[in-house]
């Protein structure tokens, strides 16, 4: 599993890459969370 936390501006973004799946979690300064996944 590959996890890359990226801090920039008001957002903290974490991406991970499973076999055939890419996921993204984004958290803003207010604690709102956005999650995205895609299967290739």
UniProtKB/Swiss-Prot annotation:
Reactions performed catalytically: N(4)-(beta-N-acetyl-D-glucosaminyl)-L-asparagine + H2O = N-acetyl-beta-D-glucosaminylamine + L-aspartate + H(+)
Post-translational modification: May be N-glycosylated. Cleaved into an alpha and beta chain by autocatalysis; this activates the enzyme. The N-terminal residue of the beta subunit is responsible for the nucleophile hydrolase activity.
Gene Ontology CC, one term: extracellular region
EC assignment: 3.5.1.26
Tissue specificity remark: Expressed by the venom gland.
Keyword Oxidoreductase part of the UniProt annotation: no
Compartment list: Secreted
Chief location of this protein within or outside the cell: secreted
GO biological process: proteolysis
Transmembrane regions listed in the UniProt entry: none
Disulfide bonds: none
Signal peptide, first to last residue: none
Record family assignment: Belongs to the Ntn-hydrolase family.
Subunit (UniProt): Heterotetramer of two alpha and two beta chains arranged as a dimer of alpha/beta heterodimers.
Protein name, UniProt field: N(4)-(beta-N-acetylglucosaminyl)-L-asparaginase
Organism expressing this protein natively: Asobara tabida
């Amino acid at each position: 599993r590959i996890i890359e936390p990226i801090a920039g501006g008001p957002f903290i973004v974490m991406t991970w890459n499973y076999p055939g799946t890419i996921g993204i979690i984004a958290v803003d300064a207010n604690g709102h969370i956005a999650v995205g996944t895609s299967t290739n």
